């Protein structure tokens, strides 16, 4: 659906690979990572750098449950296993922390979200006491099930011994003829496990990327989140919806960024820096009281204090 020769997980948001976003947010919460890949995955392995990664091959694609089953030899009995998805790049660290915390208490926690339009997603089925009973996929859902707006994100955390046990009990008796990872929820309920649910506050945080439209939406959401964080730290943005940082930006006091400015790579701004509209700044350091005039392109440069930079100079 990406209509690209590039692997989906190597498309970028904020100039960072989708999979790298997931690795970066997870690495501070886990001791090791098992990443499931298919054949012809050398480009993915070469692009992603993290010492905690163990690459696991899934020879045949027989569903999400089958994918996770490939990691069984590497799952430790007393560990908490966190299951994430390579095409969900906006997940926040605090959400992972909460999910793991709940799993340590009950043995199993699940991340859900409420959508106005839940079409295509697995629905969370609860009993009369509000406890999670099962997850029903769109193609297997009844008319009553389809009215439910709380959906499964697929993101979960559970005890390693439980995960191994339930993965080995998965069946393929569904419309797709696949091993659904979500079926372990119903198996756990029958095993008298009380599944802790955590409803994600923002649907944006758990959006998956399946096409170029969703990729562009994720890019804008990511940039707006960065803009909000920068403004909270004192940066003045004339219009945060027309601001892009595709890398790392540090800044001093009283800096102002006008519209349509793009930062790429690693950039450092001193105090009282003014960047005018339509500038591109890449891997540069700009000194105190500098003024960057409209339409300037600065690449791998050091700009001195109290300097005025104009284009075509």
Language model segments and positions:
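Left-handed beta-helix
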Residues: 176-313
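N-terminal nucleotide-binding beta1-loop-alpha1 segment
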Residues: 1-5
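Short beta-strand/turn micro-motifs composed of small residues
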Residues: 6, 37, 85, 112-113
């Amino acid at each position: 659906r990406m209509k690209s020769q590039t692997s989906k997980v190597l498309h970028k948001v904020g100039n960072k690979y989708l999979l790298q976003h997931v690795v970066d947010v997870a690495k501070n919460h886990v001791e090791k990572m098992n990443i499931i890949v298919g054949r012809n995955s050398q480009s993915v392995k070469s692009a992603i750098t993290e010492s905690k990664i163990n690459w696991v091959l899934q020879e045949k694609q027989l569903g999400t449950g089958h994918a996770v089953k490939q990691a069984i030899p590497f799952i430790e009995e007393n560990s908490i296993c966190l299951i994430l998805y390579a095409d969900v790049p906006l997940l926040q660290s605090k959400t992972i922390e909460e999910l793991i915390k709940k799993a340590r208490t009950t043995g199993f926690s699940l991340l859900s979200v409420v959508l106005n339009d839940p079409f295509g997603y697995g629905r969370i089925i609860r009993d009369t006491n509000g406890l999670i009973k099962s997850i029903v996929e769109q193609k297997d859902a009844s008319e009553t099930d389809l009215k439910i707006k709380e959906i499964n994100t697929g993101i979960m955390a559970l005890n390693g011994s439980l995960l191994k046990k339930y993965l080995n009990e998965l069946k393929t008796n569904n419309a797709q003829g696949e091993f659904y990872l979500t079926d372990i929820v119903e198996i756990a309920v029958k095993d008298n496990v009380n599944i802790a649910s955590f409803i994600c506050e923002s649907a944006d945080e758990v959006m998956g990327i399946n096409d170029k439209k969703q990729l562009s939406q994720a890019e804008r959401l990511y940039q707006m989140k960065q803009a909000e964080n920068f403004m909270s730290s004192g940066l003045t943005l004339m219009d945060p919806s027309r601001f892009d940082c595709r890398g790392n930006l540090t800044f001093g006091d009283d800096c102002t960024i006008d519209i349509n400015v793009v930062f790429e790579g690693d950039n450092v701004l001193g105090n009282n820096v003014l960047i005018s509209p339509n500038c591109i700044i890449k891997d540069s350091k700009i000194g105190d009281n500098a003024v960057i005039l409209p339409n300037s392109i600065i690449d791998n440069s050091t700009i001195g204090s109290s300097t005025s930079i104009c284009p075509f100079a």
